[in-house]
Amino acid sequence: STAQNTLVSLERPFQTPLCPAAQPRHLGCRPSLTATPPELTGQRFTTYGASGGIHFGVDLSAPCGTEIVAVADGIVFAVDGPFGSPPHNLMVDHPQLGYASMYGHLLQAPNLLPGQVVKQGEVIALTGDTAETCYGRPHLHLEIRDLNHVTKYNPAMLINANWHNLALTGSTARDFARNLEAPRQWQSLYDQPEARTGGPIINDFAYVWPFDWRKKEDTRPLTPVSLIGSDLPEIQAASSTGPLVASPAGRQVMGGDCCTQPYWNKDSTQVRFLDRPDAGSPLGIWGVDVGQPETGPQFITERLGIYSPDNAYIAYPDQSKGVTVIERMADGQTWEIDTQERSPNFTPDSKGILWTAYDDDAPSDNREETLWLADVDGSNPRLLLKDRRSDPVAWLAGNKMLLARRVPGSSDQTLFILSLSDGRQTELLQLPQMRSLALSDDRRYLVYYVSLQPDSSENGTWLLDLQSAKPQPQKLPFFGAYRWRDNERLIYVPMDPNATEHSFFEYNARTGQSRSLFPGGTGLTIANNDWRISPDGTKIALVAASGIKLDGLWVLDIKD
């Protein structure tokens, strides 16, 4: 684990401001680092326009009033200075290191004065909430800047912590928007750019993935034509960087900085990913045969978009009109559906599309959202629900949908079922705010995690049996990342801030029993919480890390 140990032995002079010390109590340290998560792409000219268009720091979830400590010895430069992050902020200079640290969204103005000396580990402030409610978005926003307070650096490269470990929460990976002209750029927590206050928008990509559904005057194609070339029926890329290697539990199928956000094909024989493997290869979807990875990746298609579950249709935006185009793959016929400049999702049977419309300028904590459903050919558009902070969770059997609604004046949520046939709502129960909800394959079991609750007994990973007459949450014996394997088996990776490798376990929702999947260890670190279970439940694909660098795509065989 030499490479792993270097994660906390390089020149990282800063300690964490509240994690992992606060994490065991609050179970809420999920880092959101720099660059641009896909959901924030549209804010690069507004919220983040003054700082290069990127989220230029790290967000650390914590309940209001959590103590913040100085990340290093320093001198207070300003309290509530012109540095954003309301309602209060604090800037501390570290002249001996050549950096400054900025703490934002504080509960109250710190009781400090400019010029005052602070010591590393000394309590200097309390966490607050951007919405100033303490139930909206309580977190600390931390930036590392230069001493001129202009250049902003990636905190992961300067804070003495293992961010791959801290990212292991919930059911989804930490992904980033992609520049389609350089699809491997800025795709890990450690590989993030610097930004400058007042500097250019560095993520104003000409071609971005996921596609931007908003209307634009620019009518260029969605993908760079010069990088697409699918004339040949089969294109084989050059072999991946260096020879493929093995670990105690699995094998590498692609090397180098390849293959973030991978997914499986339906028959579990191939892992696919968006890539341009080398300068002589086209941009598009590639796949590697997990049984014969030495043959290299095979080009699948240059067509990017949202595919229906049965692969009969593909959806993509017409940005000149702000509408969605649906294309039937069999004959290329297309038609337009007005999804109000929002990306749609296909229904599980591929016969309809669903989208949520809302005002971008409205505060996200209380904005009105409308849920729409239309037949896949665009006919019969109908409003399913008009509400505030009601989010679709998953499709259920019998033409029903599971949703979660924020309780006004609280972080609690009400879980309810919406009938798509008559609009009837059936409330199940009210719960503390649920995060990263995931449904088992048969839609019976719901797993989620809770954090940031004052009563620490409410924090943790929870299981809900939706087929029970009166569903009651059951606390699970772990906290970390999780994915469903099948109808009743949940695979999880415990979140340990000090782990030197990542271990997989399986929890059986029916029996309540857990087992280690790889008792001899994996010898691997998962990057970005980026891993997927094959549809047949026999394999795990993951993006690995070696120190601060990505280490390719790996496959682990699950033995029963």
Task: Mark where each language-model region is.
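Blade-level signature of beta-propeller repeat domains, shared across WD40, Kelch, NHL, RCC1
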Residues: A527-D560
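Conserved strand-loop elements at the edges of beta-sheets that form or border functional pockets
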Residues: A62, A70, H94, H105, ...
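Surface-exposed, glycine-biased beta-strand/turn segments
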Residues: S1-H88, Q120, D129, L168-I235
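Conserved, short, structured surface segments that act as functional micro-motifs
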Residues: L90-M91, Q116-E194
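Zn2+-dependent peptidoglycan hydrolase active-site motif and core
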Residues: V71-P110, P114, T133, R137-E143, ...
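Multi-bladed beta-propeller domains
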Residues: I235-C258, G287-L304, I326-R342, L373-S390, ...
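Conserved beta-propeller blade repeats
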Residues: P114, G256-V271, P297-P317, I337-T356, ...
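A flexible loop/linker signature enriched in serine peptidases of the S9 family
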Residues: E132-Y135, G256, D275-I285, D318-T324, ...
